Amino acid sequence: MGIDVAENTGEIYSNLAPREKLLAYGSVSLTDAELLAIFLRTGTRGLPVLRMAEFLLKEFGSLYHLLSADYDTFCSHKGMGLAKYAQLQAIAELAKRFFSSQFMHEDIMSSPSVTQEYLQNLLSGRDREIFVVLFLNNQNRVICHEEMFKGTINKVEVHPREIVRSAIKVNASSVILAHNHPSGHAEPSLADKIVTDKVIDACNLVGVKVLDHLVIGRQCCVSFAERGWI
């Protein structure tokens, strides 16, 4: 009849409520817990699915930390097993591919907001600094991107020669740099400016242009290009 049969009638209603809300008012009307409940589908005895979703978000602290948890950590929580772990890992990977597909076939210089949104979703919420490089062809389309350097909570060591080597390997004409600030504040530091200049100098030697450096905070990002620093 088009409706999944569940053992617990009360559980059906707790599961359907977020779906009905989504269909009536759109996905943006749902809380993180309600969206998560739709994917989890069922709770456990004494723990309806929506309460389970709320509990998981509280325990892990954020959607990012929940979706990036390893198997042992995830399954250490009541009611969490292989099936739900696989479901959430599939969700996380689909989200990554969705955002990636949005800008892989566009001239990203004509749609910078798409790039910023992608990088915001990729890096915001990470608990240590990650330095990402987007490699572009001569039509400003993304060839690939790479998380090149991983650091600590407040610094990451960047090697310009490694960026140049990767750019040559994929025949990139230009690059966009990006890294996050786990503190949540996107304002670039003096060290950020210095390393950007070093990468620009190294790339100039082989004819690769640095188009921008984006610093990602919790809710916003700062563009070096928009500030006239590149």
Curated annotation (Swiss-Prot):
Keyword annotations of the record: Hydrolase, Metal-binding, Metalloprotease, Protease, Zinc
GO BP annotations, alphabetical order: proteolysis
Motif JAMM motif location, chain numbering: 179-192
Recorded superkingdom: Bacteria
Keyword Ribonucleoprotein: no
HAMAP family: UPF0758_YicR
Stated family: Belongs to the UPF0758 family. YicR subfamily.
Stated name of the protein: UPF0758 protein plu4865
Organism encoding this protein: Photorhabdus laumondii subsp. laumondii (strain DSM 15139 / CIP 105565 / TT01)
